[in-house]
Every structure is written in structure tokens, then in C-alpha cells.
Amino acid sequence: MSTPLVQVKDAARWFDVSPPWLERKLAGKPRVMLRAVDGVSFEINRGETLALVGESGCGKSTVARMLVGLYGLTRGDIRFDGQPLSRMSEPGGRELRKRLQMIFQDPYASLNPRWRVGRIIAEPMLTHTKMTPAERTARVGDLLRQVGLDPSDQSRYPHQFSGGQRQRISIARALAVNPEFLVCDEPTSALDVSVQAQVLNLMKDLQRELGLTYLFISHNLAVVHHVADRVGVMYLGRMVEVAPRDELFARPRHPYTRMLLAAIPDIDGTGKPRTAVAGEVPNPLNPPSGCTFHPRCPHANERCRGEAPVGRMAGGAVVACHAVEEGRIAG
């Protein structure tokens, strides 16, 4: 079996959100660490789309930024095609960096309003290639055609385009240096619903044509069902379930995954019993001991309150849940 393109093992990213040093010393306060991502592990195979889902603040976007080197690791290991991602900051790491690119969430904020579209798309080529100006102009025109725009658009400014067109420009920029792996951080969440499907279908077409691999971040489960091959579910910085898309939607195992799917309106599901999950997301600065989901879980017991679960195989899924492991709920 071929080696996965992306391998993430026990990756964590903590942020120091303590008050200033002098204030802490005078008040006798300890340092405060926000565990945005706290030990996630997963793999992404070549040509595959792995989607990460979860409520706001669960760490999805932090994982995205870790995978392209925008955030360093507090602990753990991330490898791209067998190479440690830390090599991107070393001499010679530019070749590795250009193989993975990112599409950002907000097409209104991620494009420089003072630059023409041609310069925006050509910027990665200036850094990573030795193309002549004429070659860059021709390449920009080809990229614009590839994402459904006209080559003449490279002389225009971002404000002259709609949101969907701006995101197409962002996609063209990400493709400028022929990457193998794209990290897509909620690329359609800022777009009108009528435009979302067009952009998603474009991304799927590009994946087939170019053999791309995607990490797709989203909170919209309908979008995830449309684009993903496998789905990872995050809660308070931890991965609670990873499963093939069809298996996860047909047979969710972790109680949190069940809660997310139960929130999807289902016209045909009238009369089906639904289990409401009480409580709110805990304070990430002071997360619960053991399984962080236990205050909201109807299946929690003493083990859940005192021992953090690890991911274990359950059918075709990897689930971090004591209740599933012990057979207290169907796994």
C-alpha cells in the first residue's frame, strides 16, 4: 500500500494567553495556555479529500494553518510525502513549500485590493519559479481560463468581481505553482448558497484533472457530504472520530458526531427519535478532565470523567470514545 501523502501524528498547538509578565508576578497568577489543538492524528492519501468538521472554536482552522506551516507545532509530527514539515523553514525548503498551498475562507480579505488580478495570481510564481514576465502573463491567462474566468480579467482589480469570482481568483493563485496538496479553509462559507455549488464543483473538477489532494475545513455538513471521501470530527482541539464519508453519515458512532448529524433538518425523518445534547461547549482555557465531551454526553461514566479516550478502530472508523469501546453504545 502506498504511503499517505500527509501524515499527522499527535500534533498539538498551544497558545500562551497569559497576562503580561509583570501583571502575573504582582498578582501571583500562573501562565495560561489555550490548547487550540491537543494531539490530533490522521492521514490523507493521494487524490483524496479529508474534511474536518466541528463547532466553531474546535481547532479546525488551526490544524489547517499547521499543515501549511503558518503555525508551528507545540508537539507532535507532521509529514508531507515522508518529509517533516519543519523542513520548510530550512535552506532548500522552498521546493517543499510550493507543493502545498492554501485557499482562505474570505475572498474579500485574502486578495490585496491595491493589486490587479494578474499580479495577485503571479505572486507565487515570482517566489517559486524563474519564469519570464511573458511566461507569467501566459500562465495567469491559462489559470483564469481553468477556473472559469477570462484571461482579460487579469487587468482588473478585486473589487470589480463578485464573491464567487474572487474565490475563483484565490483558487487560481493557489494553483499557480502546480501544488499537489491544497488546504481549503471553509472556501465557500462566505459565498451565497447559489454560488457555493459552482465553486465546489469547480474544485472537484480540478481535483480530477490535476490529481490534487484536499484537506477541506467546513462546518456545513451538506457541503462535506458533497466533497469529502473521509470525514474527521473535532471537538475542543481533539479528533473524536474519523470515518469514510458514507459510513459516518449512515452510522455515526461518537455521541458528538451523532449530535452534529441530528442537527441537520431532515424532511423525511419526521417522527424519528432525537437525543438532545445538553450544555454548552466548555471553556477551552479550562477544559474538563478525561473526555472533554463528558459534561454533555448522556453515556458518560466515571472512566469518561477521569481518563481521556484514545482513537480505536470500530468498523471502518477510528473513534475516541470509552462508551463505544466498552459496548455501552453501538459501535
Language model features: what each stretch is:
Residues Q83-P84, A134-S152, L261-A262:
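Conserved ABC ATPase "signature" region
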Residues A176-E180:
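A short, proline-enriched helix->beta-strand linker immediately N-terminal to the Walker B motif
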Residues L22, A27-R31, L85-Q101, R119, ...:
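ABC ATPase NBD coupling module
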Residues G76-P84:
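Conserved ABC transporter NBD signature motif
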Residues V183, P187, L191, V195-K272:
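P-loop NTP-binding/switch modules centered on Walker-like glycine-rich loops
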Residues S2-P4, V17-G28, M33, V242-G331:
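Short catalytic/signature loops enriched in Gly
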Residues V68:
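Helix-to-loop junction immediately C-terminal to a conserved catalytic motif
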